[in-house]
Amino acid sequence: MKTPTNLSDLFALSMTKFFRLIADTFFAKRYGHRAVVLETIAGVPGMVAGMLIHLRSLRSMKTGYGPQIREMLAEAENERMHLMFFIEIAKPNIFERLLVIGAQGVFMTFYSFMYIFFPKTSHRMIGYFEDEAVKSYTEYLELVKNGSVKNINAPRIAIDYYGLKSNAKLSDLIKSVRADEMHHSDVNHSYADNLDKKDQRSKNLKAVENINNNKVA
């Protein structure tokens, strides 16, 4: 996990720990059910970011935003597919389905506000979210390996999506999903780092400008 270097990073990490605590409280070691709810929420940030970056491109009438828009929308679609896999495995009950609706609505509102005003912090937070997801799937995989969770057949939809062998198991699916989350972590931390560098360059240019103005005065 990336070490926080400023207040923005600390806030992002604190929010991640807060949401992790809620997930641990509700689901404990029921990782299949945890995945259903969390993957519903995980599909939100990419869609929000992709939409807002798309709108920024339209407003500015400039190119260059395409790769990030596509990356964010691909992330959202990938997380949606994760949800489809674990619905087949966990068979969520009516309470969990209602929880999904409520959690998605709250998080959609929260993250949209965050991304409009604090895009760097938003990407950092999702990077930390994905780091926690990697931990959760690693713990899930360990339970499967030690026999605490039955290593059932992977759902057909997951086998087709990842191109797994026809006899693929839950452990194979978890490894594939975990690899996706690692990629999302790298992408979001990278975007946050780039925005951080851009902010620093702006501050440096402002400082130089102030020095030059003082010399003129």
Predicted regions and their residues:
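Non-heme di-metal
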Residues: 1-217
